[in-house]
Amino acid sequence: MSDVRLIFSVQAVRAFLYGFSSILIGASLAQSGLDETSVGIVFTAMLLGMAISSLAVGRWGEAIGRRRVYGALLVVMGAAGTVFALTGSVPFLVLAALTGTLSTDPNESGPITSVEQAMLASTPPTERSRVYGRYNAVAYLAGAAGALVAGGPAALRELLPALPPDQRWLLVMPFGAAVCAVLASRLSSAVEVDASIAPVERGLRRSRSTVRRLAALFSLDAFAGGFIVQSFIVFWFGRQFGADAALMGLVFFGVGLLQAASSVIAGWLGARIGLLNTMVFSHLPSNVLLALIPLSPTLLVAVALLLARSMLSQMDVPARQAYVAALVDPTERTAAAAYTNAARHVVRPAGPALASVSMGMSAGLPFLVAGGLKVVYDIALYFAFRRVRLGDD
């Protein structure tokens, strides 16, 4: 099996686990009797953990070796999942969350993804955007499947009351992580940076200022995204239109399928019109659709706008990953991916808190703020980087 297929296989298992665990972690925390503050601390620790561990990968990843870091992170993911399966103690949950290897999003963008992005960048430049497109499509499809399967334990418990509680089903995490680690152990040395390059020459050097500018812009996009996290959207649809969890589950399953399809299209599009153009010209109209959602007169119109946005909103993800890889030298790719991903996680926790405040002023204000900030991001990104030549040019 080729290195690309091995990475895709690990991504599929990870995304399934994240889709599965994101539902069960939320359900088990709700059943545990923890107050809202404690639950908020746990989820904030997940985001902070991703930022901290991504920075660590960026700083030391190349020196240690991509395969070693990759395997170690997968083992830690299994250990962290085991903690969530066996205890409800907040200090232990926070420590597990701070590893940065758990995610509430099937398409995680933490330290593991940073290493995968760097390894996939070894593909030829003409194929790179398509590879990243398929890589993200795998995550969306597997994550959607994991979320659907997560409803199984509760349904089966109605027939078999003796089945263990939702929390214990998280023990699937260490088994899945073991499968991932075995697959990762089969990666060849081709995914590593050139061994002839001295360690002191690795990490961010020539592209340091460029990556900092890019990370600052990515953080603006992530901050805006924090206003409209999935849980908030479900809450808003329920408050505005009375949509129940069953309906929204189907809606977000559809969202996952559309995002998978759009990732494949983005890979094809990036090879034809350019990565920066793909990022901006797909993302910009999606943000206009986002701002229109609170103006919808009916549930049907709001769902249609949400689905239409989903077809466009994630097309920038594979293009962004390929763009970062092409923008820097090969020895800088792990650091560049890690630092730009970390920048997104540092600011994202502020979004939900501010969304709750803005919703008190107007129910639809979070959508308008998020859409407006994202439009500013798109325009700023285009004008800041439209004349920057990529390393592969």
PLM segments and residue spans:
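Helix-to-loop junctions at the C-terminal end of transmembrane segments
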Residues: 53-65, 154, 262-275, 359
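Hydrophobic core of transmembrane alpha-helices in multi-pass small-molecule transporters
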Residues: 12, 80, 90-111, 301-315
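Intracellular juxtamembrane helix-capping segments at the cytosolic ends
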Residues: 102-124, 315-328
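Structural signature of the two symmetry-related core transmembrane helices
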Residues: 68-83, 277-292
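Transmembrane alpha-helix termini and helix-breaking/packing motifs in multi-pass membrane transporters
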Residues: 26-27, 31, 143-164, 234-235, ...
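Symmetry-related core transmembrane helices of the 12-TM Major Facilitator Superfamily/SLC fold
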Residues: 167-185, 367-383
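Helix-loop boundary and gating motifs at the non-cytosolic
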Residues: 1-48, 210-218, 222-252
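Central cavity-lining transmembrane alpha-helices of secondary-active solute carriers
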Residues: 41-58, 253-265
